[in-house]
Amino acid sequence: MNNLSLKAWRSTVSCGPNLRQCVPRISGAGSRRAQCRESSTGVATCPHLADSEEASAPRIHSTSEWQNALPYNQIPGPKPIPILGNTWRLMPIIGQYTISDVAKISSLLHDRYGRIVRFGGLIGRPDLLFIYDADEIEKCYRSEGPTPFRPSMPSLVKYKSVVRKDFFGDLGGVVGVHGEPWREFRSRVQKPVLQLSTIRRYLQPLEVITEDFLVRCENLLDENQELPEDFDNEIHKWSLECIGRVALDTRLGCLESNLKPDSEPQQIIDAAKYALRNVATLELKAPYWRYFPTPLWTRYVKNMNFFVGVCMKYIQSATERLKTQDPSLRAGEPSLVEKVILSQKDEKIATIMALDLILVGIDTISMAVCSMLYQLATRPVDQQKVHEELKRLLPDPNTPLTIPLLDQMHHLKGFIKEVFRMYSTVIGNGRTLMEDSVICGYQVPKGVQAVFPTIVTGNMEEYVTDAATFRPERWLKPQHGGTPGKLHPFASLPYGYGARMCLGRRFADLEMQILLAKLLRNYKLEYNHKPLDYAVTFMYAPDGPLRFKMTRV
């Protein structure tokens, strides 16, 4: 954000010293048609819903709630200018905001306009309706049907449905897909992904990977016992190794020493970071890539093609292994990939499932871990509480982890939840409204993209007692040393809610719990450098080198 524009913005907004940086994790609903449609109310709405309009007025229009509500065009928000609308605010030189600063905008909008804000006039996009009322967010979630429309990345939609329609066809997966195609695909993979027996199967393999990672960390320490400046790349390697073990049924070799820049694991990491961290640029700036292949779009497609090739390679390997293996010799619980291949008889389904898990998982989990480690290193009192809990549960630091042991790690889990509340990696969620609604006393037409910036609501005193204080004990029950207070269940939802809740959430939780348990039982983490601000790339995380000091305890 250039200084002049930021100064002009702040002159109309009162920002407190504890302002939380936050932004919705929402990138618009894309389609083969590039333009948003204009409704009769003058609002740009999602083109996906245009074909489903009924001639008769919706039932809600006859209710007193609707008739007493204010019209949509009276919802407060930044005013668009002719031709450029509000898109100019994100443009270089003349704009008010940069992509990395966009986290601040959600909180600024709330401070300026209140609990509901209309951000319209975005070229090629539906209106964004920011909702800062947890009760209204709950109402939106609870009123959705069996196929909620979650706004997704138009760039990914175009890649799946146009650029690589030859591969995906009618099997788009669970990311960037909506309606019956989404419901059918999710129903085919949901059971094996969410089964507790599947989760338990990966505890020991993920623990081994994490132990290998910690050995590598020790080898990376310098003479001051500090980790290197690019330690976030090492966390990405750990995350990729974990996801590869789950989604591709293999060890990718990410944690090997002297990994070359052109090695497959590093290429996967680089491709994921590029693809995901440029999504905000692709989506929030003028979408020229919709009309002609820009350099950024061309590289995005190249990276996505690389992902597809990697997934196909390892899923085909798993399929061949199943074909040649004597069924009578299979022992124990089948792997996730094996379950999907055996139940669906279609390796493409397993390939697309793996692709979606990797795309969504690598950067999300990596950045969440970066944030958690930074908070641990800068909060020694909280770190010590977790260490004491782990020392009590694991007197012998070499004791293998089990699900019952993880279930007793209340302080560790409370710490994770508190980091998500105050510094949530996924900084918001949203829905494209499937029908006309009344929200915060306004008439809102279907097709509008409702944004739920939970990192704002999760830090509002209205919904959380002593919201500005980092207090993991708020998540614990009294018998476990907790100090419960007011905590609205829809104020902080890092994994979303309902039918479109994050499919890989149980694996994400398992990976993070294993890493923190193994790390904090055996090591002390410190950060002795300049405090880091948080910024948005694709995720919300500390912006700077994570030069942690890591010593055995």
From Swiss-Prot:
The keyword Heme applies. It holds the Pfam family p450. Signal peptide: none annotated. GO terms for cellular component: mitochondrial membrane. Its EC number is 1.14.-.-. The keyword rRNA-binding does not apply. Its cofactor is heme. It is found in: Mitochondrion membrane. Gene3D superfamilies: Cytochrome P450. Keywords: Heme, Iron, Membrane, Metal-binding, Mitochondrion, Monooxygenase, Oxidoreductase, Transit peptide. Heme binds at C502. GO terms for molecular function: heme binding; iron ion binding; monooxygenase activity; oxidoreductase activity, acting on paired donors, with incorporation or reduction of molecular oxygen. InterPro entries: CYP11_CYP27_families (IPR050479), Cyt_P450 (IPR001128), Cyt_P450_E_grp-I (IPR002401), Cyt_P450_sf (IPR036396). GO terms for biological process: tergite morphogenesis. Belongs to the cytochrome P450 family. PANTHER family: CYTOCHROME P450 (PTHR24279:SF120). This is Probable cytochrome P450 301a1, mitochondrial. It comes from Drosophila melanogaster (Fruit fly). The lineage of its organism: Eukaryota, Metazoa, Ecdysozoa, Arthropoda, Hexapoda.
